[in-house]
């Protein structure tokens, strides 16, 4: 028979272990570290990397964070007014959509077309908002979401809840997580063949 003291000690040990696990979960959620980090799906990695290289203002974590916010990496995403992995409206796609995979068609539903088109359009938006006061990345993201005219008219991020939430989520939540995720990816990538780690 287990004494009361033995049961108490056992319960205290179990409670301490549970608190330790909970603390680790909270720290991971607050810092964005650990297995909960978002990652670029392997099938889109090379497309995102090459698209980000086409514009000096872009980088892989920013492109990834924006795609995550737009569609959660779903190439068949359809919000009713925007389509595909990069969520282009039909009007914007007709101007900025390009054939990125070389099959002769600019297809909003094809990530190899949509992701490079997203980079091209974002690069254009950086130029459009260059004279607007504020952070250029936040302004370009706001223009992607609300349209460049809305940003120019507001002389900043327009007072549209959806747009403000979109910019905030990308810049303050997703981008830091993708920066950490990409740093971890880079540190775990095998070294190029023929080189040795010293």
Residue ranges: model-predicted function:
Residues 56-83, 87-96, 119:
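Secreted/periplasmic proteins that engage bacterial cell-wall peptidoglycan
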Residues 43-50, 54, 90-153, 167, ...:
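Alpha-helical segment that forms one wall of the substrate-binding/catalytic cleft
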Residues 7-32, 186, 190-198:
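Extracellular cell-wall/glycan-interacting regions and their flexible linkers
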Residues 1-17, 37, 170:
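N-terminal export and membrane-targeting signals
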Residues 23-75, 127-130, 177-181, 196:
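Export/targeting segments at the very N-terminus of extracytoplasmic proteins
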Residues 39-49, 86-91, 148, 161-198:
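Cell-wall glycan
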Residues 71-79, 128, 147-157:
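Secretory-pathway/luminal and periplasmic proteins that interact with or process carbohydrate-rich
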Residues 39, 80-83, 109-112, 135, ...:
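Residues at secondary-structure transition points
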């Amino acid at each position: 028979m287990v004494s009361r003291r033995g049961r108490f000690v056992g319960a205290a040990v179990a409670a301490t272990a549970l608190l330790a696990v909970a603390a680790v979960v909270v720290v991971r959620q607050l810092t964005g570290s650990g297995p909960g980090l978002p990652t670029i799906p392997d099938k889109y990695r090379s497309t995102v990397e090459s698209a980000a290289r086409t514009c000096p203002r872009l980088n892989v974590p920013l492109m990834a964070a924006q795609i995550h916010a737009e569609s959660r990496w779903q190439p068949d995403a359809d919000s009713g007014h925007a389509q595909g992995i990069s969520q282009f409206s039909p009007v914007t796609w007709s101007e900025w959509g390009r054939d990125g995979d070389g099959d002769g068609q600019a297809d909003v539903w094809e990530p190899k077309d949509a992701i490079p088109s997203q980079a091209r359009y974002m690069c254009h938006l950086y130029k459009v908002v260059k004279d607007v006061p504020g952070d250029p990345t936040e302004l370009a993201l706001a223009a992607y979401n609300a349209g460049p005219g809305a940003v120019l008219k507001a002389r900043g991020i327009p007072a549209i809840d959806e747009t403000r939430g979109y910019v905030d989520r990308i810049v303050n939540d997703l981008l830091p997580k993708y920066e950490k995720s990409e740093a971890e990816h880079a540190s775990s990538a095998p070294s190029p063949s023929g080189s040795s780690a010293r």
